[in-house]
Amino acid sequence: MYVVSTKQMLNNARRGGYAVPAFNIHNLETMQVVVETAASMHAPVIIAGTPGTFTHAGTENLMALVSAMAKQYHHPLAIHLDHHTKFDDIAQKVRSGVRSVMIDVSHLPFAQNISRVKEVVDFCHRFDVSVEAELGQLGGQEDDVQVNEADAFYTNPVQAREFAEATGIDSLAVAIGTAHGMYARAPALDFSRLENIRQWVNLPLVLHGASGLSTKDIQQTIKLGICKINVATELKNAFSQALKNYLTEHPEATDPRDYLQSAKSAMRDVVSKVIADCGCEGRA
């Protein structure tokens, strides 16, 4: 079985002192880049999709594509619902075969966040589906959800333990100073907060908003307990900019099989670097 849950992946990463990258994909080409690169580097990876991606590509289509590529490359893959907010939407996709879910209602008050997350956990665990949730809130925009910098807040380590125990989640996404999107300047990550969270929470920890972080910062977060690194914007930017450049230089180009190659190559460079930064090459 090549389509797997993230639970074992992240537990292996936790024991091994590395992180598993979760790459947000959008179509056939972006998925090809992630899977082909991961297979060539023998690295465990997570294929992540926001609600918008699943709407764009179709849940059944994405599931079939992940399954086919996992078998083709003899490489274990996990497909993950990223930043999903609605129970019915999650339930439908779980019934379609998705094995990993992020329920994100971190904008709600603490008690409501617990209640909504626990409802999803209770349902998903019946199907052996792993669940990630977020405590604290990142600034920036992910899909159609935008959080102003003033409304972002960091994860409280003591609350994090209560949250993890009350919900039964399998992994916890933390807010320590990252944001969705690219950074105008390098963020100042709160490493001491992350270290405290690890001491209070006995779960794999997840870092969102990793696009544009330095290798040094990524590797320091892994040392302090991060087991899953989410990358989205950096992939889109590399793909899109290379495509724009190619079409500007070759205005006569009309064959997608040709002009998409430069976009895939640029994105492949990002995927390779993230895998190396996460220390997961050769771990699949």
UniProtKB/Swiss-Prot annotation:
<dbReference type="InterPro" id="IPR013785">
    <property type="entry name" value="Aldolase_TIM"/>
</dbReference>
<feature type="binding site">
    <location>
        <position position="181"/>
    </location>
    <ligand>
        <name>dihydroxyacetone phosphate</name>
    </ligand>
</feature>
<dbReference type="InterPro" id="IPR023955">
    <property type="entry name" value="TagBP_aldolase_GatY"/>
</dbReference>
<comment type="subunit">
    <text>Forms a complex with GatZ.</text>
</comment>
<dbReference type="InterPro" id="IPR000771">
    <property type="entry name" value="FBA_II"/>
</dbReference>
<feature type="active site" description="Proton donor">
    <location>
        <position position="82"/>
    </location>
</feature>
<comment type="function">
    <text>Catalytic subunit of the tagatose-1,6-bisphosphate aldolase GatYZ, which catalyzes the reversible aldol condensation of dihydroxyacetone phosphate (DHAP or glycerone-phosphate) with glyceraldehyde 3-phosphate (G3P) to produce tagatose 1,6-bisphosphate (TBP). Requires GatZ subunit for full activity and stability. Is involved in the catabolism of galactitol.</text>
</comment>
<keyword id="KW-0456">Lyase</keyword>
<dbReference type="GO" id="GO:0019404">
    <property type="term" value="P:galactitol catabolic process"/>
</dbReference>
<dbReference type="GO" id="GO:0008270">
    <property type="term" value="F:zinc ion binding"/>
</dbReference>
<keyword id="KW-0298">Galactitol metabolism</keyword>
<dbReference type="GO" id="GO:0009025">
    <property type="term" value="F:tagatose-bisphosphate aldolase activity"/>
</dbReference>
<comment type="similarity">
    <text>Belongs to the class II fructose-bisphosphate aldolase family. TagBP aldolase GatY subfamily.</text>
</comment>
<dbReference type="Pfam" id="PF01116">
    <property type="entry name" value="F_bP_aldolase"/>
</dbReference>
<dbReference type="GO" id="GO:0005829">
    <property type="term" value="C:cytosol"/>
</dbReference>
<dbReference type="GO" id="GO:2001059">
    <property type="term" value="P:D-tagatose 6-phosphate catabolic process"/>
</dbReference>
<feature type="binding site">
    <location>
        <position position="180"/>
    </location>
    <ligand>
        <name>Zn(2+)</name>
    </ligand>
</feature>
<feature type="binding site">
    <location>
        <begin position="209"/>
        <end position="211"/>
    </location>
    <ligand>
        <name>dihydroxyacetone phosphate</name>
    </ligand>
</feature>
<feature type="binding site">
    <location>
        <position position="83"/>
    </location>
    <ligand>
        <name>Zn(2+)</name>
    </ligand>
</feature>
<feature type="binding site">
    <location>
        <position position="208"/>
    </location>
    <ligand>
        <name>Zn(2+)</name>
    </ligand>
</feature>
<dbReference type="InterPro" id="IPR011288">
    <property type="entry name" value="TagBP_ald_KbaY/GatY"/>
</dbReference>
<protein>
    <recommendedName>
        <fullName>D-tagatose-1,6-bisphosphate aldolase subunit GatY</fullName>
        <ecNumber>4.1.2.40</ecNumber>
    </recommendedName>
</protein>
<dbReference type="InterPro" id="IPR050246">
    <property type="entry name" value="Class_II_FBP_aldolase"/>
</dbReference>
<keyword id="KW-0862">Zinc</keyword>
<keyword id="KW-0479">Metal-binding</keyword>
<feature type="binding site">
    <location>
        <begin position="230"/>
        <end position="233"/>
    </location>
    <ligand>
        <name>dihydroxyacetone phosphate</name>
    </ligand>
</feature>
<comment type="pathway">
    <text>Carbohydrate metabolism; D-tagatose 6-phosphate degradation; D-glyceraldehyde 3-phosphate and glycerone phosphate from D-tagatose 6-phosphate: step 2/2.</text>
</comment>
